[in-house]
C-alpha cells in the first residue's frame, strides 16, 4: 500500500506540474501585453497653425508613421513644408462634420475636387496596416481605390467603417483641442465651414528617435 501511495503521489505531482505549465503558457507575459498596447512608430512630425475667420485658434502637431507608410508620409511632409513649390500653407479645411471628421488638403480648388500629390495627380493606396482607432487619427481622403492626392482628414471619433478603404498615416499628438474647435465651427448644408478654416502656416519637426504610440 505504501509503494502504491508513493506512486500515486508521484503521478499527481507530475500532473500538477504539467497543468501548471499549461496555465503558465496560456497567460500572456509582460511583453505580449505590452505589444498589444504598442502602436506604430512616429518617425517625423508636422505642424499646422490654424485660423478660423480672423481668429488664430492654435497649433496641431501630427506624428507620422514613416516606417509603416513611407510614401504617404513623404507626400504629407513635402506638402507641409512646400518644398516642391506647392502645398498646404494657406489652404482650407473645406469639409467639417461633427462627430465624424474634418477634411482639408485641397490647395488647388479649395472645395474638395482638387489637390495633387508630389508623385503626380494621384498615387496608389500604400497599405491598410493601420486603422481608424479613434479620435485624432489622420488618413488620406480619396475618390475610390488608388486615388490618393493631397486631401486628408482627421477623425474626431472612431471610424472603423473606413478601415481598409483609406490609408491611415498619422495621429494628432498635440492640439486635439484645436481640432475640436474646428469640428465645432458652424457649417452650411454641404458641410462647408461658414468661416474659412485656414492653415496659415505648416512645416516639419524632426524626431531624433522614433517612438511608438498607443493605438487607443
Curated annotation (Swiss-Prot):
Gene Ontology molecular function terms on file: peptidyl-prolyl cis-trans isomerase activity; RNA polymerase binding
GO terms classed as biological process: bone development; chaperone-mediated protein folding; neutrophil chemotaxis; positive regulation by host of viral genome replication; positive regulation of multicellular organism growth; protein stabilization
Chain positions with N6-acetyllysine modification: 165, 209
Reported tissue expression: Expressed in the kidney thick ascending limb (at protein level).
Protein name: Peptidyl-prolyl cis-trans isomerase B
Principal localisation: endoplasmic reticulum
Self-association state and partner proteins as the record states: Interacts with DYM. Interacts with CALR, CLGN and CANX. Part of a large chaperone multiprotein complex comprising DNAJB11, HSP90B1, HSPA5, HYOU, PDIA2, PDIA4, PDIA6, PPIB, SDF2L1, UGGT1 and very small amounts of ERP29, but not, or at very low levels, CALR nor CANX.
Listed PROSITE patterns: CSA_PPIASE_1, CSA_PPIASE_2
Function noted in UniProt: PPIase that catalyzes the cis-trans isomerization of proline imidic peptide bonds in oligopeptides and may therefore assist protein folding.
PANTHER family: PEPTIDYL-PROLYL CIS-TRANS ISOMERASE (PTHR11071), PEPTIDYL-PROLYL CIS-TRANS ISOMERASE B (PTHR11071:SF477)
Family: Belongs to the cyclophilin-type PPIase family. PPIase B subfamily.
Modulation of this protein's activity: Inhibited by cyclosporin A (CsA).
Reaction(s) this enzyme catalyzes, per UniProt: [protein]-peptidylproline (omega=180) = [protein]-peptidylproline (omega=0)
Span of the signal peptide: 1-33
Residues bearing the modification N6-succinyllysine: 84, 209
Top EC class, one word: isomerase
The species this protein was found in: Mus musculus
